[in-house]
Curated annotation (Swiss-Prot):
GO terms for biological process: co-translational protein modification; translation. NCBIfam families: pept_deformyl, PRK00150.1-3. InterPro entries: Peptide_deformylase, Peptide_deformylase_sf. This is Peptide deformylase. CDD domains: Pep_deformylase (cd00487).
Length: 202
């Protein structure tokens, strides 16, 4: 029996999240979130060659920063780091729901079905606009331990992943907004420049 309990304990340890972080906001987050107009948001990120403690530390700092801003997703370029890393937690108010870390994420396929939904961004505070995106996607990535993963995502998760991967490619969600009048209005109201928006080709 002792051996069985030891194995159960070992298995339980394996299931623990590799990155543990409180979801409570902190007064001084470890990272600065760059805003629309900064070149950091327009520079494509580089692939991560080695997943090590430094990458896990970055992911943890990104999560702390994200939670402190009450966001559900954050990409490394948003904090001025050009690495293909993003973190997501759709249940940021639930302390028992673990966040997800995506390293070198790539969309393998997208659905022909699309939908329109309002998006916001920690790098463009106060601006909320409709964006058309595929309803579901298939994704490949590595987790925080460097293990290769694949997943199917739909709904809000699919949208959030696409939004954050755009950041890895130097694209902001406002680049994909088609309602020009509302775009100009909200940018102006929140002290952003229309000239900082680059119309996306897809």
């Amino acid at each position: 029996m002792a051996g069985s309990f030891a194995q159960l304990a070992k298995n339980a340890e394996k299931k623990k999240p590799s990155i543990s972080v409180s979801k409570e906001p902190v007064e001084n987050p470890p990272l600065k979130v760059y805003q629309l107009g900064d070149e950091a948001l327009r520079t494509p990120a580089n692939r991560i060659v080695k997943v090590d403690d430094a990458i896990r530390k970055l992911a943890k700092d990104m999560l702390i920063t994200m939670y402190s801003s009450k966001g559900i997703g954050l990409a490394a370029p948003q904090v001025g780091i050009q690495k293909r890393l993003l973190v997501i937690d759709l249940n940021f108010e639930d302390p028992n729901s673990p966040p997800m870390v995506f390293i070198n994420p790539e969309i393998i396929s997208s659905s022909a079905t699309v939908d329109t939904y309002e998006e916001g961004c920690l790098s463009i505070p106060g601006v909320y606009l409709n964006v058309l995106r595929p309803s579901s996607i298939k994704l490949s990535y590595r987790d925080e331990m460097g293990r290769p993963k694949k997943m199917n995502a739909d709904g809000l998760m699919a949208r959030c992943i696409q939004h954050e991967i755009d950041h890895l490619n130097g694209v902001c969600f406002v680049d994909k907004v088609t309602d020009e009048e509302e775009l100009k209005k909200q940018l102006n109201e929140n002290n952003f420049k229309r000239s900082d928006v680059i119309k996306a080709t897809n």
